Every structure is written in structure tokens, then in C-alpha cells.
Amino acid sequence: MKAIKYIVLILFGVISINVCAQNNNSERFAIKASAEIGLGNSISSNSYISSLSSKATTGSYGLDFGWTFWSQKGHRLEANIGVAYSPAAIELELGSFDYNYGAPATADMDGESYQRYYEISNLHQKVSLGRVTLPIYLTYGYKCNGWFGLHADLGVRFGFKTNATISEVSGEAYSYGIYPQYDNLLIDESYLNDFGTTNLANAGYGTPVCNGFSTSVLVGVGAEFSISKHLGADISVRYNRGITNLFKEQYSGQDFTNASAPINYSVSDGQQVKSLTDYLSSSKVSPLSLRIALIYRF
């Protein structure tokens, strides 16, 4: 019996503790359907642009399977493994920002290279992310009475990116170029269809660069309430430490003068503007969340 216990623990990769109420000691298995909501501003970020601000919401919806491998006098140890889908929505705001780059010869009508300048104002960008997460944790629990118990969680959570899209953009971009063949005179003419002012609403979007894999340590405390003989409800607070680099580092500073444009999406008339997500050096999910679950024990 002990060998089976150790094999199951190794298989689950468990490093967690979860205290659960139980209706009777014969219940060895549990199915837990849960929803988890991020608390506060769920994404914090570092950026090369000091005026860039962000706010976000996160959530998680999943199903866990638990196996009680030890119980005695109201105490229980339980191994858990599950799967969940975790969507996130991040809104980025920027009042104004300027940058420039050396455009290649192919960008010009007569095959000459030139310097292009951008002035961005009132830029708003919304990014939608999705991840599949695999929580693996242990359970220690104390049954206070027939309908109420306390629990504490300790484990790990693995995350895998499923999608990342720029779902909304608004703001304005004004661009112009300096051409060496015209003795560095400022050129701003309507026939250059990628110059002038462009409204960025309904632009054609690129894909934000996001880390495809993440890992965090899962810690939680909460209470379980009995609803019927086998059905219970659980409310807990969880702390997921270690989910970092949701966005990868792209550049080492604010100097974007180079041979190719630092571009992620463009609008229909050819005006190009860099995605705000590329200016994030790093970001991370807020570690604190509220979890509500329905539990069926058998």
C-alpha cells in the first residue's frame, strides 16, 4: 500500500498541501469544478516608456481530480491534479511617444533610403491572452464538524499559451521622412501614402510576443462547506508565485534607429506603427486570486 502511495505522488509531481472537509472517511476521490478570479490589477509590467500604463483582468476555469491517500480523526492528505483555461485581458495606454528609424531603400518610391519619424498620441491597445494551466498540489485538511472544514494548498502550476492577439487599437500616428536626395529637406506630401496623420482605429493587427510556457508555486487557504452527502462548496484564496515574462524582452533601450522598422502591425494605407506590447521588457500576473469550487466526493 505504501508503494502505491509513493508512486501516485511521484506521478502527480505534487508539492502541495490542501485541507478539506469530508462527509465520511470512506470517501477517497473528489472531482472539483472551479472558477478563479484574479484580484486587483492582475498584470504588472516594466517598460522602456515611462508614460506607458496598463490594467488587466485574469481568470481561470477548470476541473481538478483529488485522491485521499491518508485520513485519520478528521485529518486528511489528498493529492490533486487538474486542468484549467486561463484567459487574460490587458489594456495598455500611452499619451504620446516619438520614435524614428532608418527606412530601407525598398520603402521609398525611387529606391532611396531615408529616415522615418513617428509621433504617436492617445494610443490605446487591448491584448487578449489565453493559457491552459495544469495545477498539481497536495491536500491537508481538518474536518471541524459534519458540514464544515478548513484547507490549505501547496503545489505547482504549469501554464501553456494557447492564443495571443491584439484585439483593439485606437489613437493617432503622424509620420514624416527626411530624404538625403533632397538635401535633408522635410518631405510631407499627400502622394506619399504612408506619411501624414492616420487614425489607428480598426487597424490590421499583428501578434504580441508572449512567453509560451510559465510556472508558478501555488499556495492557498480556504474553507469547504457540505451541501449534501457527497456535494460540497469551497471558497479559498490562492497565491500563485512565479508567473513572469508574459511578454518577452524585445529591445535593450529606446533607441530604435536601425536598418529595419520595429513594426508589428499596419493600417490599410501603409502607415506603420509599432505594437505597444513590444515596448514591454517584462510583465507578470498578479499572484493573488479568489477561487470558488463545487466538489463531488465519492
Predicted regions and their residues:
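Short, proline-centered helix/strand-breaking motifs
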Residues: I17, S128-T139
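Extracellular/periplasm-exposed beta-strand and loop segments of Gram-negative cell-envelope proteins
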Residues: G40-A56, A88-G130, K161-S214, L246-S289
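Extended, basic/helix-rich recognition subdomains
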Residues: T215, G222-E224, L231-S252
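Residues on the lipid-exposed face of transmembrane beta-strands in outer-membrane beta-barrel proteins
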Residues: A33-I37, Y61-F69, V83-Y85, L134-Y140, ...
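Short acidic (Asp/Glu) patches
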Residues: Y117-S121, L134-I136, Y142
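Outer-envelope beta-barrel architecture signal
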Residues: N25-A33, K73-A79, G130-V132, G146-A152, ...
